[in-house]
Design a protein with these regions (language model features):
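Small-molecule-sensing regulatory modules
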Residues: 1-36, 41-47, 51, 124-318
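Short, well-ordered beta-strand segments
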Residues: 5-7, 66, 84, 112, ...
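Short beta-strand segments
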Residues: 68-69, 97, 112-114, 154-156, ...
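A conserved helix-loop-strand patch within extracytoplasmic ligand-binding domains
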Residues: 70-71, 79-129
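Glycine/Thr-rich phosphate-binding loops of Rossmann-like dinucleotide-binding domains
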Residues: 76, 121, 163
Length: 318
């Protein structure tokens, strides 16, 4: 029996994710590290810089499955491929490193992150903070924190856990305002369809509840028309037969945001995600996201136009 070839980026986190997928599949596995454009140049670009080389290898038949961090996968996939499986989701939320609680971070502290979503949420909760761009993989960001380039950094809990470094985290950020990126904490397995590899992944790797949440979250982002770096967060949680969804869209300076939630049948995750997006659009998310694009910030100062779930103002830290 020939080995099933799992393509992955070569970072420590990506390899850990690939090994976790391999452990779920019966039979011989070969993990194939592939260098992506994002590994070579971390300058801001679209999500395909992290996935394009993997997709090309998949389409060419050089690998059987591509293993991704789901939050890095673009909305449009290579023709003839699909996300066919997702193992059980890890913690989807963000954590502080360097402080236990957001309200314990000193006034004016330097907080490091590279995500516009996190920047928008941090400044919405704490406009006094100095949010600095901090790039690199998890290890690099932790080294930069230790070197004093920031007082506190924000990372995904899942990434730290997969590297056995969750003990370095402080508190988890309040998911009411700090809605995570779509797919955060999920490992996405992409395959050519139809294929025996896809069938194997579905049978042994896929966690149905996680896949339903991922489908709903990705559908919401597509329906919002959000670019790959837009300050948008979408989360879904399966509760019995219902999907509990929450969405965030904001300006990078934290001055304006839309926050909404939606509950729908889990029978059609894509429809649930699209409906959350429609609710957010009606509340002004489209205008917020248009102005969040570089060069589109409109005139005026800090204007608030906020939609709070159930009418309650969100807090800043768990």
């Amino acid at each position: 029996m020939s080995a099933l070839r799992l393509g992955t980026r070569g970072s420590a986190l990506a390899l850990a994710q690939a090994r976790s997928v391999a452990a779920l599949i019966d039979g011989p596995i070969e993990i194939v590290p592939i260098t992506t454009a994002g590994d070579v140049d971390r300058a801001r670009g679209d999500k395909s810089r992290w996935t394009g080389a993997l997709e090309a290898a998949l389409v060419a038949g050089d690998i059987d499955l591509a293993v991704h961090s789901a939050k890095d996968v673009p909305g449009e996939l290579a023709e003839g491929t699909a996300i066919v499986a997702a193992p059980r989701r890890a913690d989807p939320y963000d954590v502080l490193v360097g402080e236990d609680r957001l309200d314990g971070v000193r006034e004016g502290a330097r907080v490091g992150t590279s995500a516009l979503r996190r920047r928008a949420q941090l400044l919405a909760a704490r406009p006094d903070l100095e949010v600095r761009e901090l790039r690199g993989n998890v290890d690099t960001r932790l080294r930069k924190l230790a070197a004093g380039e920031a007082d506190v950094i924000v990372l995904a809990a899942a990434g730290l856990a997969r590297l056995d470094r969750l003990g370095e985290a402080g508190g988890r950020l309040d998911g009411e305002l700090f809605v995570p990126a779509a797919g955060q904490g999920v490992i996405a397995v992409q395959a050519r369809v139809p294929s025996a590899a896809a069938d194997a992944a579905i049978a042994s790797v896929n966690h149905a509840s996680t896949m339903a949440c991922l489908q709903a979250e990705r559908a919401a982002v597509r329906a919002l028309g959000a670019s790959c770096h837009a300050p948008v967060g979408v989360s879904a949680r399966l509760d019995a037969e219902s999907l509990q969804m929450r969405g965030f869209a904001g300006l990078p300076d934290g001055s304006e945001w839309v926050l909404d939630e939606h509950t729908a049948s889990a029978a059609d995750p894509a429809a649930a995600g699209a409906e959350l997006a429609r609710r957010m659009q009606r509340a002004g998310a489209g205008d917020v996201l248009r102005r969040a694009e570089p060069g589109n910030a409109g005139p005026g100062g800090r204007v608030s136009s906020r939609v709070f779930a159930q009418g309650a103002k969100p807090g800043g830290a768990a």
